[in-house]
Amino acid sequence: MVDLRRPDYDRPRVLRHVDLVLPLLTLAVALIGVVMVYSATRGPATDLRPAETFYLGRQARLVALGLVAMVVAGWYGHRRLHRFVPLVYVGMLGLLGAVLATGIEVRGARAWFQVGGLQFQPSEMGKVVLILALATWLGRTEEPSGPRVAVAVLLTAGPVGLIILQPDLGTVLVYGAIAAGMVLVAGVKGRHLFILGLLLVTGLVGVLESDVLEEYQVRRLLVFVDDDAETTASYNLEQAQVAIGNGGLTGRGLFQGTQNNSALVPEQQTDFIFTVVAEETGFVGGAVLLGLVGLLLFRVWRIGQMADDRFGLLVSAGVFSMLLFQVFQSVGMSTGIMPITGIPFPLVSYGGSSLLTTFVSVGLVQSVHMRRHERQGRA
């Protein structure tokens, strides 16, 4: 057994096992994001629009801060965080409750705190907290029992219920993907998976039938079901698909996208950032970006396989599930194969909360890799 109470923190020995591929891939994708955010937001300064380098500078600073956060997370270690999980989980629930009362509303969702000129979305960092909480709980046994799975469901349902009230359907789906991926890797029995599937379907139907979702969110889902629905969401999807089609094989050239420069695609620096990539760099550029993300995902999965305990394995599985679902959903809603739910492309979309969350998550996976020999060292 790994002694989580007194982990061995021999820094020189641990640093010898730093994985260089993981941060290099992460940085490469993030730098592509900086360029794409600049392309999506560039333009002359006016009374209504910041200078053309405003978003570029902010995104670059966020990437630099994210790199620091990734290093700190890897250095501090996932096992040290293990002991604080209950306290941090309760704190997350407190923040999610507080944002409903004191947060600001952005695009119909009360999900952000305003601190000076900065906005902070607690549900983003809550993804990391959920991963740690589920890894702690599910990692205690080789094959989680029914009661243990039930508690895992409750651990997920707590933050999900508060996020639904914001309402933020996209983040709810990400939390669900995290939980689903970790439950599968944890080795939950088939009958328990079946029950979880029924609960998931029932919950989704309940949310859709309730009055919790905003009207614009319902319209987005309606467009996915009915392509002929005449709504703002259908127009947005059409413009996104036109932008992707304009790119062709090699794209129109960096900063030369017609849909982009005409600002016809909504939220193109955040939710629809992939349309900027596809229009300006074409199929080739989109394939390169997705290829880099694929390599990053493969590395996260491989590190999970190398973990020397179930806690590290499940942390890696949670990060893998989070990134995979967000990339698939972000690209899918730009191309029309998935409903529009407002999920950012990890490391590429503009936004500090999402970017920092992803960097911290990768840092935790780095910690798993750095400490994969501790168990053998104490054997």
PLM segments and residue spans:
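Hydrophobic alpha-helical transmembrane segments of multi-pass inner membrane proteins, especially
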Residues: P23-S39, A45-E238, G245, T275-T335, ...
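N-terminal low-complexity, intrinsically disordered patches enriched in charged
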Residues: R42, W75, A179, N260-L264, ...
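N-terminal membrane topogenic signal
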Residues: R11-T26
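A juxtamembrane structural motif centered on a specific transmembrane helix
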Residues: M1-L4, D8-Y9, Q326-A379
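Aromatic-anchored, glycine/proline-accented short structural segments
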Residues: Q239-Q241, L254
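Long extracytoplasmic/lumenal interhelical loops at the membrane interface
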Residues: L249-T281, A307
